[in-house]
């Protein structure tokens, strides 16, 4: 069996680290990068890869790894699954995962593809570790502490608000599963 040809859809922080992981994986080959701007202003580190606006411009893609904002995942995944290309995403809105699973599952089955959803940190690998520890100590007390660190999803959500030029959301742990969210906003008000 040959290498798995993967396309990275989106080239922000997650896309950059996805590319780095693919480059380190001996069983994967980078099919290309899909960016809103395509090859326009192509970063130097992408010189050896096809950079396109539409995944249809790439050849023989086995899987698309969606490194897009969470709220864009369903739209991109449906378009890509309809091409018969498998998808992996890190969708992280916990309350909408069941609906996303249903929606993408139907599309994937209709086009003989597979959709792996919420395969990021939380939900994702952190959820698996938490479930494993709860199975080992079912009467124990389980806390999940996050941070300190940048909350990319919350930062993206605030940036989507009209009038916000830039935003940074930080997660600050307090302990016992409780955290604070600090949001810094740069807004340009025209006088």
Question: Which functions belong to the PLM regions below?
Answer:
Residues 5-18:
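Glycine-rich adenosine-cofactor-binding loop
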Residues 25-44:
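NAD(P)-binding Rossmann-fold cofactor-contacting core
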Residues 53, 60-82, 94-98:
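Beta-loop-alpha module in the N-terminal Rossmann-like domain of NAD(P)-dependent dehydrogenases
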Residues 92-114:
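Rossmann-fold NAD(P)-binding glycine/threonine-rich loop
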Residues 121-122, 139-153, 165-172:
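NAD(P)-dependent dehydrogenases' Rossmann-like dinucleotide-binding region
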Residues 125-141, 156-167:
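Oxidoreductase and adenylate-handling cofactor-binding alpha/beta cores
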Residues 154-174, 180-184:
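Anionic-ligand binding region
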Residues 189-191:
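Conserved small/polar residues in nucleotide/adenosyl-binding loops
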């Amino acid at each position: 069996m040959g290498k798995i040809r993967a396309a990275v859809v989106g080239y922000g922080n997650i896309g950059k680290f996805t590319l780095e992981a693919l480059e380190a994986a001996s069983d994967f080959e980078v099919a290309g990068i899909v960016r809103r701007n395509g090859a326009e202003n192509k970063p130097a580190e992408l010189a050896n890869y096809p950079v396109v606006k539409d995944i249809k411009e790439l050849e023989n893609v086995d899987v698309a790894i969606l490194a897009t904002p969470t709220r864009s995942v369903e739209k991109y995944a449906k378009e890509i699954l309809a091409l018969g290309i498998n998808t992996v995403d890190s969708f992280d809105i916990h309350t909408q995962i069941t609906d996303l699973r249903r929606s993408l599952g139907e599309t994937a089955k209709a086009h003989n593809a597979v959709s792996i959803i919420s395969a990021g940190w939380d939900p994702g690998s952190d959820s698996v570790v938490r479930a494993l520890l709860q199975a080992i100590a079912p009467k124990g007390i389980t806390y999940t502490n996050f941070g300190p660190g940048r909350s990319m999803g919350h930062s993206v959500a605030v940036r989507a608000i009209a009038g916000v030029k830039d935003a940074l959301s930080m997660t600050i742990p307090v302990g016992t599963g409780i955290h604070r969210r600090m949001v810094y906003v740069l807004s340009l008000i025209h006088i």
